[in-house]
Amino acid sequence: GEFSERLAESAETRGAHVMKIEGPLGGVPDLNNIREVIEEEKPKAILAVHNETSTGVANRLLNEVADLAHKNNAMILIDSVSGMPAEPIDASRFDVVATASHKALMAPPGAAIVFFNDAKMGSAPRPPAIDVAKFVKSMGKLETPYTPPIPIMYALNVSLDIILDMGLEKYVGIHMEKMNYLYNELIGIGFREVPQPFFRSNTVAALYSPIEPQIIIKKLRETGYTISGGMWKIRDKSIRIGVMGDVALSDLKIVADALRKIIQQNK
């Protein structure tokens, strides 16, 4: 997907020799293929996107990939920007997991949140800025080495209270309920899901559209709701709808009804 490509590009710009292991559109790479590449190439690190928003795919085989990585003395680094905490992931199984404030954590954009295994922290050259080691050193003094996004941190604190008061399991369940409703309704009016059912994300739906996607986006915006067009290889033939965070099921029912009318009027 788009963000897996960006992750590879990011590694390459930092001097890494990147080998891509590709899977089918709407799915994830085969575990046996991953195992063969790891055992043959002996990489220093494995990078993966947990929740690929361009295709609506959640990689639910990452625990097995982590086991393969650690068995072969490789680090495993995960991009979960649009996944945590609505798409479950056990961060303790990985060396680095990065997310952000503005997706399923329901806060405004502006803060990066990173889990890391401190045992591996010193194994890579340190960059001139955003040095994790400096953050760790400052934590003991309840300080940060650089000016933090204070308003975002306050907003994040509020959103975390909401999630924790609700309970993480219930929060995940609500997202699954919203996503199941959305797919069931839209498939019934002619849309086709992009992700394979087992890998269907809890936070973003990606669907092939029965009519021109831009018509749908424009007409839906007139009702007061905004959705996104496709990305990557399916940019011109799909739509994406985010359900993460504070998106109510009642909103999705309105969107589904509006989409039904748009499809009927534009066949």
Predicted feature locations:
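Active-site C-terminal subdomain of aminotransferase-like
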Residues: 102-188
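Conserved PLP-binding catalytic core of the aspartate aminotransferase-like
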Residues: 192-220
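Conserved active-site segment immediately N-terminal to the catalytic lysine
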Residues: 91-102
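Active-site phosphate-binding strand-loop segment of PLP-dependent enzymes
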Residues: 29-81, 85
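Conserved PLP cofactor-binding pocket of PLP-dependent enzymes
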Residues: 223-240
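PLP-dependent enzyme catalytic core of the Aspartate aminotransferase-like
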Residues: 237-267
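PLP-dependent aminotransferase-like
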Residues: 1-44
